Amino acid sequence: MGFHQIDERNQALLSKIAIDDGHGENSAYFDGWKAYDNNPFHPENNPLGVIQMGLAENQLSFGMIVDWIRKHPEASICTPEGLEKFKSIANFQDYHGLQEFRKAMASFMGKVRGGRVKFDPSRIVMGGGATGASETVIFCLADPGDAFLVPSPYYAAFDRDLKWRTRAQIIPVHCNSSNNFQVTEAALEIAYKKAQEANMKVKGVIITNPSNPLGTTYDRDTLKTLVTFVNQHDIHLICDEIYSATVFKAPTFTSIAEIVEQMEHCKKELIHILYSLSKDMGLPGFRVGIIYSYNDVVVRRARQMSSFGLVSSQTQHLLAAMLSDEDFVDKFLAENSKRLGERHARFTKELDKMGITCLNSNAGVFVWMDLRRLLKDQTFKAEMELWRVIINEVKLNVSPGSSFHVTEPGWFRVCFANMDDNTVDVALNRIHSFVENIDKKEDNTVAMPSKTRHRDNKLRLSFSFSGRRYDKGNVLNSPHTMSPHSPLVRARTY
């Protein structure tokens, strides 16, 4: 029996959480990661491997952080220059965290939001990354079985982060492409009514702003609509703002903190902000998650719960010094935004040349790519078939829209900031060859007699690189040939 199998004896011995598959590891979202892990692309060691485009990571400005650390060795307690503070930092720290870190974080959060709002360091609660912070807030607000309304498409791992251990439920607020997936009051009310009809107690609304996977920002009117909605129903509003410094073009980012300060009759105790340094600074391995709540009880309880997932004092010490360097922070935020904008513009421009459009976005480290025209029919089954071809034959790990609970098949999230320029070139060349091959086969299909064309209506999904002409001088553009009947990963169909 393998690690992924649970026999009858263990089903009787273990807890419901232990035997439950609520983690979602068997979803298409995580299956794509497994495909990459089993066959990772490397320009020299494995040029025919899978390119990771399913990881929402920002590596474009990583060198700036490395340079700062080189210039400030005293910021680390593990260097000769910083060793004198080793004992005081390495000894026991309570769950409030280092005061200098909370102060630096509050200042940084304000700077990211253009200085239009200030944050109180005493309200900052730390957790083990955004995942831990998210779960802690849910534990504070909901009992098992309670529900949260979440506009879809939404972050695929919310099903794990928000539901698995808390036993809370998610009710999607369905948004569609006709208005660029914007949240409306009508959609909120429909979802709320649906929860009531299912005898579920709605405890709040959860949004990501900027949006993952859309890469768009909420405007002030929509944020005010959300605040009004939760005020009327006396439920909570959780705003995940972990991508707030990834905005690279207009409109600028508006934090819910600004709306809270400006709106009259706002019930502040219902508003909670999630933040992290994983996306804005590109430091997911540091596991820095932040809860900023306007509710005193939530602040107190979340701080006590943070004992189960603290940020190491060594990490706090280093980041306190870095985030307190205002000149560095100003330069980093400006340059990071510039680099993200340039990468996004280049990536979408090349896709557009191939006839592939993306949702117009202004933030994030990904694009919401529209491949509806490549589906053999407008179903999620067809989307999964196309996704398997992209994973197994084109060798790109992109995430299918169904993983994000979108209502329209054919959308894919594609990350562009977790790789260097050369890898981007390889990925774009693979996409170009794939689309070109499909278009050629489609042209041939149109030229066939009607009966033959009917028999060949699956040409769109029977793609193989074996018939391509390769540039022998550029082996990086030549993925493994793989039979469409031998999928590398087991994907879930909807």
From Swiss-Prot:
Keywords: Ethylene biosynthesis, Fruit ripening, Lyase, Pyridoxal phosphate, S-adenosyl-L-methionine. Residues 475-484 have a biased composition (Polar residues). GO terms for biological process: ethylene biosynthetic process; fruit ripening. Its EC number is 4.4.1.14. CDD domains: AAT_like. Residues 474-494 are annotated as: Disordered. Catalyzes the formation of 1-aminocyclopropane-1-carboxylate, a direct precursor of ethylene in higher plants. This is 1-aminocyclopropane-1-carboxylate synthase 2. The lineage of its organism: Eukaryota, Viridiplantae, Streptophyta, Embryophyta, Tracheophyta.
